[in-house]
């Protein structure tokens, strides 16, 4: 039985482009600048006391091979690095400003709780009076199930009344909340992230008060089990501690998850405030909202004081203002001068405190930062981002629940650490994904210098019936986050899709209608915060949005070829994006299984094997995608340790390859976010690179290395080559800092498998701030390198600034000798001729002298059958568009792509071909397109397979989850009729020694 995988189904959404507004991005041209080859070691085995030996020693002394650290050493550095960061940022967490006078509060922690019954619907007084069966719970309280339900919270309390007003405040309740005080309905609210309150002074009494809270949940607009709801919720939340339903993929439950209290206030009090900094003019505009309960117009005195919050400075500001005030909300603006302000940024998050007082009685405080974040909408391509007028590139990851749980659990030390875990791996921003969160999270990001993108909780679509409610909640979102210098950007919707391709267009907004909604939301946001940078869409599946920065999501090393093939991304192509605009990539990544220690400690026993050697498949883990998706990336494994190893190995590789590929396109990609950083629960979102126990997976460290702000990077489309080939490797400088660098030297050293230097190359160069540029090519002539069959070589580069090495990179490849005893082949068809002419394993011959017949065209089948009957020569069938569905010798052969995505990797049957590595048939070079291209796009469908040399796994369709072992589908096979293959050979033979050698070994084995 197959289960539904919603997120895999969404990933299969095809991006339909309004082409007239879109443009494809070609790779950045690499200049024809060659590194100078300065040293060549001719015979590495004969270097005793001659000059070559001295050269080797000199190279080794200055440029020792940059060995990869062990995971254990990286883990040790991680813990030490976090402690250093805690010490570094401790001063910014220490308050130096005076406190405002706090209002008196009565906080409610303990409630009786139960789900609504039929009796409650018939007689609501039963709830108000506390009849029925209740359980005791403690706030915060978030729970399941998902879907439609109603619950009640009830508590009784005494209260001391005086001449002040009494406001009941809810900091966070999900989703539709109704509040009753002493049987009076006093307050309603729809949503989950925004605080709401009401004056209940008239309904309170000294003794025996009863507070009842009705919380109603709904199905989200994404739907559940074929039903659609109206809940404005995306796919990110708090979850709950239940391994079956609560851990995984942020299920949309509900409940009162934040503080509830009654607060005493003056009849005239400060309701809200926001500071809009203007660093260009060294001023700050303070917006103050004052509420007045009195029914008459009167005078109010507003006192404002500003001083440094977390640093020592002589700056102090005090001001007294007389204003008229009416009943209700009154909005005032005050401009103050802050000369030579300390600017807020990622490294020095300086904050100020403003205290606002009304009539010398009520006080309100708020921290703010003097910073400017803006987007260039004047110069093409639009979309360059700036922090404090310096260009900036946003490098980060997605957050889905773990920070929110820190606040719920009152664990602020963990909250600090989670933000610093991001900083340690060179992130400068969090995408707090698909929902606004508790204010404490933004406050700590303010103090720790972590920039944040805040998302409105929409995913895929917006129901027409919720058009205006969603607009209202967008305003709430901006009011919720606008005070925080860390929040630099907002977005409205995640992965919108073309509603005309669904059966819900009568329910949901079309793309054009959604654009209208965006325009309204833009105006709402600008009303609340004129300086807000807006990115309307995250991961646009119905592009483009007509204003602002575009965004795409890319999972092409997990959901195969999602957005664009990995070979294209690696080469430098981008998906088609909005004309004249830069873009962002707000999600990319792969799943990596949790560490074994975490599994043993937290997983249910039924998910795990009895011992580490027992046969085990990860389909036991609820909602895990590894068993469904791994087949295009690595072998199916037998035991839990190997599954974890290969899963994490692939995740680490993908994190590095994709991050660096996106960084190389900083000319257009100004923002990137890995999906995800830290898990909120065991196996919650296994695309995370740090487990819920805060122990990193290997991918965390490759991600960290790929995000080094000033980095040297090697790029080459070939992983293998022959002796006598000339290999050009691109060298890039990726500079995410705003600093220009001159006086730079890059030294490249070619090493053999023993890390002895073979050749040395040099280039003098420079680097511009916030630019990624290819500075040149390292041309490796392999003709003078001795090889015995296969030689592992490494090209290492050392980037120096003013004589000091500041970064290194390594590119590994294999060099092969052409040691084939060439097989005579008679070719039938153009592709067959091309294979014979370009593959060093074959040579052309006539049909009488040939060892084998190679056929690639259906029109030659009769000739092949005649040869088979007359001289019984073996035949190699290359299935392609000219030879796809055919009969031969009473057997039918079809070329099928059913449940096989175009694969960059195909497993080799190592029991039949034991001399090959598991990943030898991956990331093959295509000389026709000059990039990495598919290994195979089809498998062979036939009724008889004797030997299967290369295969692919049958994969579930997107939206399904595979259970049990997967069927193997032949890609290179043999039976009595001959050898059959769907390997892509055009452009691959002659330039990929492994695929040449596999063909040779299979054919030679039958001769």
Q: PLM features: residue spans?
A:
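Catalytic beta-strand/loop cores that center a nucleophilic Ser/Cys/Thr
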Residues: 528, 901-997
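Active-site region of glycoside hydrolase catalytic domains
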Residues: 271-275, 285, 475-612, 668
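Active-site-adjacent substrate/metal-binding segments within catalytic domains
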Residues: 141-156, 164-169, 174-182, 187-190, ...
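Substrate-binding clefts and catalytic carboxylate motifs of secreted carbohydrate-active enzymes
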Residues: 2-119, 252-255, 490, 523-526, ...
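Beta-strand-rich binding/interaction modules
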Residues: 181, 283-323, 726-766, 773-779, ...
